[in-house]
């Protein structure tokens, strides 16, 4: 924290705290606190640490990839204690954090008018200037939409991987040829960020002059949202 405050955040209106009580009391009421921690038990643990220091009507926002059923439970728990809770799906990664993300909030509806100007100000903007952030609905609906969003994205990634496999192993195309095909697809109906970066990845060479794609392990990790989407589809 101190390295960030004294580094990239230096000269900006950003303060760092190591004590939760001190952090909470530094915020004017009704407080809006956004949690960006790993989904799962870490969210519950942080909430339990925050609860004793909150005032009635304060708002907690979970911006992680939480399971929507966990968000359903957390909304009910927070409201029972007199607080409000927003489960906000956030898409965009590091680039989105710096230049605007897509944000999908849901939960305690009375919180929306208060967090709307904040979330929409940091959201990406469409070509007509519309913020990529609108209220989704009650309880865990925001995280449900993020789950479906990720499920669709992973499906697209699998299609791209299969197209790559066919071109490489059945058609015998090299990386340069495949990059041109993906770049061509990106000029038409298939245009998308994933298609665009696939072409760029296939072109990329490392310091030795070899294609980096040929040195990457053929495996991928996941945070659970794709699996949850498939389970919900089956149910």
Annotated model-derived regions:
Residues 1-32, 36-54, 74-82:
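Conserved N-terminal Rossmann-fold NAD(P) cofactor-binding segment
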Residues 2, 155-158, 220-227:
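Short acidic alpha-helix initiation/capping motifs at coil-to-helix transition points
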Residues 20, 47, 164, 229-230:
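Generic structural marker for isolated residues within well-ordered, non-membrane alpha-helices
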Residues 43-48, 62, 67-179, 187-214:
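Rossmann-fold dinucleotide-binding core
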Residues 58:
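Glycine-centered, small-residue-biased loops immediately flanking beta-strands
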Residues 214-235:
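A conserved active-site cap/scaffold subdomain adjacent to cofactor or substrate pockets
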């Amino acid at each position: 924290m101190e390295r960030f405050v004294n580094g990239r955040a230096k000269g900006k209106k950003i303060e760092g705290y190591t004590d939760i009580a001190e952090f909470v009391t530094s915020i004017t009421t009704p407080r809006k606190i956004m949690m960006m921690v790993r989904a799962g038990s870490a969210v519950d643990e942080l909430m339990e640490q925050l609860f004793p220091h909150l005032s009635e009507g304060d708002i907690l926002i979970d911006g992680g990839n939480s399971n929507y059923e966990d968000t359903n439970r957390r909304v009910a728990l927070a409201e029972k204690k007199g607080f409000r809770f927003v489960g906000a799906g956030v898409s965009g990664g590091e680039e989105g954090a710096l230049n605007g993300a897509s944000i999908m909030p849901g939960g305690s509806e009375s919180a929306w008018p208060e967090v709307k100007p904040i979330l929409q100000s940091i959201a990406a903007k469409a070509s007509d200037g519309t913020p990529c952030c609108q209220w989704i609905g009650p309880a865990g609906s925001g995280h449900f939409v993020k789950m479906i969003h990720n499920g669709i994205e992973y499906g697209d990634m699998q299609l791209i991987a299969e197209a790559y496999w066919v071109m490489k192993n059945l058609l015998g195309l090299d990386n340069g040829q495949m990059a041109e095909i993906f770049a061509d697809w990106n000029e038409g109906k298939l245009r998308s960020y994933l298609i665009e970066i696939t072409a760029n990845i296939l072109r990329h060479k490392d310091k030795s002059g070899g294609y980096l794609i040929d040195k990457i392990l053929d495996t991928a990790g996941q945070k659970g949202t794709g699996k949850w989407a498939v389970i919900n589809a089956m149910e």
